[in-house]
A protein has these predicted regions:
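Conserved non-cysteine loop/helix-boundary elements of the Radical SAM core domain that shape
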Residues: 1-193
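Long hydrophobic segments that form regular secondary structure
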Residues: 192, 198-203
Length: 208
């Protein structure tokens, strides 16, 4: 909570801070004197800082936070409201339960749909992360995934980032054993076609 409060606090005193330094660029290269900073005024409660920010010169128009579809509950939602969060990012990765289980994602498509409704019912904007070319996926499966996302999941924004083999992961072990070969490596045009499909079929109201 202190982190979020200080986001609004720093925006609210931004121009007061600039006046403390004859050359603002020096401020960026010096160790900030917290005592001097608090002489401007000490930070208030997060609710007070958010209220002040509504009319501040440096106005924070949105705060985005990332979580999992299976990690939401009333307590977390209350915290999001208190922290001034306006947009929530959900790591969905895929909409096929078989693929989600294979990669040990730990949640299901049903939990994603519940989280989407839960957040929208409480007036949050929602981003989701989608990952084509996961183990078990094919170009056809991934195209169907985007159809499902646009027609059923209905996010406000979506980030698409193809699966990447990274060190110290089970996917790397599968890759080295040859049990997982990204379809991009078999034919890179397949992945390009899938990403192109995600763009050309994307509704106007989804930010991609």
């Amino acid at each position: 909570e202190r982190y979020h409060r200080d986001l609004f606090y720093s925006a609210n005193i931004y121009f007061d801070l600039r006046r403390l330094y004859a050359n603002y660029n020096n401020c960026l290269n010096e160790k900030l004197d917290l005592e001097l900073l608090h002489n401007i005024r000490p930070p208030l409660s997060i609710a007070e800082e958010i209220k002040i920010n509504k009319t501040a010169k440096v106005h924070i128009i949105g705060v985005c936070i990332e979580t999992r579809p299976d990690a939401l509950d009333d307590e977390w939602l209350w915290r999001f409201r208190r922290w001034g969060v306006t947009r929530v990012q959900l790591g969905a990765q895929h909409v096929d339960n078989k693929i989600l289980k294979k990669i040990n994602r730990g949640h299901t498509i049903e939990q994603l749909l519940w989280a989407m409704k839960y957040l929208k019912d409480n007036c949050f904007k929602i981003d989701i992360h989608i990952m084509p070319d996961l183990p078990g996926a094919t170009p056809e499966i991934d195209k169907a995934m985007f159809d499902y996302v646009y027609s059923v999941v209905c996010p406000d924004q979506m980030k698409v980032y193809p699966c990447e083999v990274v060190p110290w992961t089970i996917i790397e072990k599968w890759y080295k054993k040859g049990t997982y070969i990204p379809y991009f490596e078999k034919n890179n045009e397949d992945l390009i076609d899938v990403v192109r499909y995600s763009m050309t079929t994307c509704p106007n109201w989804v930010r991609l």
